[in-house]
Amino acid sequence: ACYWAAEYICAGHYADIWEIIMFFCSKHIHLGNPKLPIYLDLRLTHFKQILNGGYQDNVLKMRNNYKIRKLFGEIISVLCCSKKKHTFDNIKIKKDDFNITKITYKMKADSTTYASRIFKKEDPNELFIGINEFYWNILKSQKNGSVACYWLEWILGFEDICKKENKRYSGGRRSNMPVEGKYQKDVIWMIWECLLLEANNRSKGLHKIMTSLLGLFCLRYKPGVRRRRKYLIYFGINLLTEPLDNTIPIIKNEKIIENIISKINVIYKQIKKNEIRPDTDYLFNNSMTNNNLEKTINKLEKMNALTGFTPRE
């Protein structure tokens, strides 16, 4: 796993590797390591600090940064050592289910006050019932995760239908969501407000985990990632509706992980050994010291003399 992660790193595909990490954590581990989102959120912050330390214009250079190699080596090792749980099944919503008059049998909430806790006047009234049922099912008194997931899919599906009909729904602005201002009106934040509010009603620790899940969900957020990252929401639902073992440590087998990290450069040497490079590789050398810069200029001059080629600046 560390080898293939290193391949992504060498290619500069950091967005892809973070998507894989979030997907695996939320779909295959979730309650097997319930505090894992806190760890990943901290590591994501560390990654951003390294990136903003001078690599924004050339992320490929980060592959030679030992901190980056160590960071992802540790993350992948922690994921591999975490206990795996059942995967979440996709819940399919029938077309008729979007007709409120035909799904009254699914409405179990004993009051309409639950949605009112987070509903804003700008939020679509069509989603009030869905949000109310969602909130009802994540309550401590109910803990019905499967039905809560159904209503999550119902809300996402309702948006999809509106798009097909060239209708656009947006909610009230939720400025507490850590995304660009133009995305703060997305209705998905209504779901997250329900999760955060209920988690806060339970315990500070649970609220911290939920906040970390939100931080991961919001990474470079655009509306298109909602479906791809929905298992982070499933994870959040399960935190509120399934038995939670707070004694599970985030990192197990620390010695094994330390051993892997200590040998992480071996993987990169193997990748370097197998690298297929053109003869002009020196043009793309990341370590441009004065000495090899002069050599590069000399070689370019020789190329120009032989071919009449004038390189663009």
What positions do the PLM features span?
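C-terminal alpha-helical interaction modules of replication/initiation AAA+ assemblies
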Residues: 3-313
